């Protein structure tokens, strides 16, 4: 598929996601699957979109192997890789596989740190990790992570909010 054809395919996929709320879960999966069928069967971008459709439709056990295959290809760009990791981490949480979710999200968080400022979806990784920690019963750690993630986005009190979030985890606070 040429670059122009791939861009056209991506545009049509994006158009489907724009109307996803108007489709039934089954229609969304069918529509994305039809678009994915235009690509090779092992195409990581098509696998990723198929996983997203199943995830959105509440078919987590169908999404998981597709996310894994897309990630295993090593061909996803940093943004899609981050999205696939985040979404697979969330899927694993929904499937009750909390430790696996945490490991995957921590690995993605490390990739974000290695990429430096502006890493794709850094805050989003942290938000989903906080949900995993809540599901594990680690609510104080989850709250600290969520508040520390939020702090830079506040119009005021950024430093004090970040410091207070970190202080939640100090032994004297427990």
Task: Briefly describe each language-model feature range.
Residues 22-26, 60, 98, 139:
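TPR-repeat structural position
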Residues 32-33, 68-72, 106-113, 147-152:
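Amphipathic alpha-helical segments of tetratricopeptide repeats
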Residues 42, 80, 117-121, 157-160:
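Structural signature of alpha-solenoid helical repeat junctions
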């Amino acid at each position: 598929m040429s670059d122009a054809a791939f861009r056209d395919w991506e545009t049509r996929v994006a158009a489907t996601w724009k109307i996803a709320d108007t489709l039934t879960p089954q229609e969304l999966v069918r529509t994305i699957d039809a678009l994915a069928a235009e690509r090779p069967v092992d195409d990581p971008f098509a696998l990723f979109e198929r996983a997203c459709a199943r995830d959105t439709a509440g078919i987590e056990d169908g999404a998981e192997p597709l996310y894994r295959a897309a990630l295993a290809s090593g061909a996803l760009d940093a943004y899609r890789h981050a999205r696939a990791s985040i979404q697979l981490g969330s899927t694993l949480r929904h499937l009750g596989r909390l430790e696996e979710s945490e490991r995957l999200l921590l690995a993605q968080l490390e990739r974000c740190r290695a990429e430096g400022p502006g890493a794709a979806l850094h805050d989003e990784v942290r938000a989903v990790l906080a949900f995993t920690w809540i599901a594990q019963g680690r609510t104080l750690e989850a709250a600290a992570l969520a508040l520390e993630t939020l702090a830079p986005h506040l119009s005021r009190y950024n430093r004090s909010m970040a410091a207070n979030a970190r202080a939640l985890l100090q032994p004297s606070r427990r």
